[in-house]
Regions:
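N-terminal periplasmic "start-of-domain" segments of outer-membrane beta-barrel proteins
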Residues: 2-28, 58, 66
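Non-catalytic regulatory/gating segments with a bias toward low-complexity or hydrophobic composition
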Residues: 19, 27, 39, 99-101, ...
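Periplasmic-side early beta-strands and strand-to-turn transitions of outer-membrane beta-barrels
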Residues: 120, 128-129, 151-222
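Short acidic/polar hinge/loop motifs at secondary-structure boundaries
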Residues: 60, 76-103
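Extracytoplasmic beta-strand/coil segments of soluble accessory domains associated
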Residues: 36-77, 97
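Outer-membrane beta-barrel pore domains and translocons
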Residues: 6, 104, 122, 135-141, ...
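Short sequence motifs at beta-strands and strand-loop junctions characteristic
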Residues: 53, 111, 139-142, 183-187
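A beta-strand signature from Gram-negative outer-membrane beta-barrel systems
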Residues: 90-131
Length: 222
């Protein structure tokens, strides 16, 4: 089932728009500190860093610039195209059920920001999510990533899905000896919470919120 092409759940074969679906298994095969880096392994999708000091960037689809790529969470445009990189950094990977990607114009449904395409991140259903998930990763550059997810009941009719992502890289390196940091130093924390409320006639209402903070430093080594 896919949602992105029609704004409602339909079979992938019945969607009027070609939708590519990537599951958590894809993310596990290509481990990275955030979804932003993971998407570089998708054909036609190119995350690009635009600043060597703060490492901010955007996502190009089929060669079109980042402002023409829409990023949504559960079909909702949480951030604008210009700030999409921060939206992708702020989603704990343990909460992702799948990623749906539309390449090419999707502006008929989602407006002018989706001329290049769109990336729709579908989070897990709180009712079906595991009680606890966790992932810890480190690299030989001393990058440290902790990703946690859990669910718990809130009262009699609500279930909360909570995810926390922590990233730390404070090891300045200059491999090419140009007196400029090769990778921006970062200290990043993101929290995502999704509440699911049971309603009559098997209907469900959801409420989601996120918190993101990051400190970045780059530039001259001295």
């Amino acid at each position: 089932m896919v949602i992105t092409g029609t704004m409602r759940a339909v079979r992938k074969s019945e969607s009027p728009i070609a939708v590519e679906v990537y599951t958590p298994q894809f993310l596990k095969k290509n481990p990275s500190p955030s979804i932003f880096e993971s998407l570089q392994n998708v054909n036609g999708v190119r995350p690009q860093l635009n600043c060597s000091v703060c490492n901010t960037g955007d996502i190009h689809i089929n060669g079109l610039e980042g402002p023409y790529t829409m990023v949504t969470i559960d079909g909702m445009p949480i951030v604008s195209s210009l700030a999409s990189v921060y939206g992708l950094f702020g989603i704990p990977t343990q909460l992702i059920d799948r990623i749906e990607i539309v390449k090419g114009p999707a502006s008929g449904l989602y407006g002018s920001e989706a001329i290049g395409g769109m990336i729709n991140i579908i989070t897990k259903s709180p009712e079906k999510a595991p009680v606890f998930t966790g992932n810890v990763m480190t690299t030989n550059w001393l990058e440290h990533t902790v990703d946690l997810g859990t669910k718990f009941k809130v009262g009699k009719k609500a279930v909360s899905l909570l995810g926390i992502n922590y990233y730390n890289y404070l090891n300045p390196l200059d491999k090419n000896n140009d007196q400029f940091t090769d990778v921006t130093l970062q200290h990043r924390v993101s929290i995502f919470n999704k509440l699911s409320f049971k309603r009559k006639h098997n209907r469900v209402a959801t409420l989601a919120g996120s918190y993101f903070t990051a400190t970045r430093w780059g530039g001259a080594m001295r």
